[in-house]
């Protein structure tokens, strides 16, 4: 089932790798949200935080899944964090996808960053990364499986009520590491999630 998907990622460092995901054609262009031309992004940034929030919120409209594309520094990006918070709380499924193993334009890979979903928890204290599934685009064959991951994410989110919001967890939460071998993702203590593309 095709799902409108918001891609969240660190624009400056990971836009090339995120574009490889975008151009895989797993999600049709009309169902992709969160991608923006560099000049347009700079224009929005100059207008301030409210303009950025409004742009993100507009991009999230009509989407049902958010794909968080994880690079080396993604977890520390303010707007990725905002996108995750808004995505879950509006009812989007979320899937985390490591993209550091995708080669860049110089044919180089990057280091694995931590999962930004570690930094959020549900109202019952459950850490979001134990609910939402996480995959590696290369190891787990994202080109073949992204559609399935998006469906999983939406199904997982549907198990939680609209009032089951997330908030930022404290800094002492144990961080999950990127998968080292092919797998279906981390074994969740509860279900898991997915979708979008992020900036600076």
Please give the residue ranges for each predicted region.
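Non-catalytic, charged low-complexity extensions flanking SF2 helicase motor domains
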Residues: 145-157
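A short acidic (Asp/Glu
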Residues: 18-19, 78-81, 106-108
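Glycine-rich, charge-decorated loop segments at or immediately adjacent to ligand/cofactor-binding or catalytic sites
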Residues: 102-123
């Amino acid at each position: 089932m095709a799902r409108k998907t918001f891609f969240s990622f660190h624009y400056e460092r990971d836009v090339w790798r995120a574009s490889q995901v975008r151009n895989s054609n797993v999600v049709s262009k009309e169902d992709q949200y969160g991608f923006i031309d560099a000049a347009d992004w700079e224009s929005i940034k100059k207008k301030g935080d409210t303009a950025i929030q409004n742009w993100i919120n507009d991009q999230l409209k009509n989407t049902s899944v958010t794909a968080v594309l994880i690079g080396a520094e993604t977890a520390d990006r303010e707007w990725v964090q905002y996108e995750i918070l808004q995505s879950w709380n509006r009812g989007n499924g979320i899937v985390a996808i490591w993209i550091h193993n995708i080669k860049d334009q110089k044919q180089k890979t990057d280091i694995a960053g931590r999962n930004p979903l570690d930094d959020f928890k549900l109202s019952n204290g459950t850490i979001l990364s134990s609910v939402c599934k996480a995959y590696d685009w290369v190891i787990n064959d994202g080109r073949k499986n992204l559609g399935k991951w998006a469906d999983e994410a939406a199904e997982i989110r549907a198990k939680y009520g609209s009032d089951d919001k997330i908030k930022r967890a404290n800094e002492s939460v144990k961080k999950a590491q990127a998968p080292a071998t092919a797998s279906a993702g981390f074994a969740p203590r509860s279900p898991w999630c997915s979708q979008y593309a992020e900036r600076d």
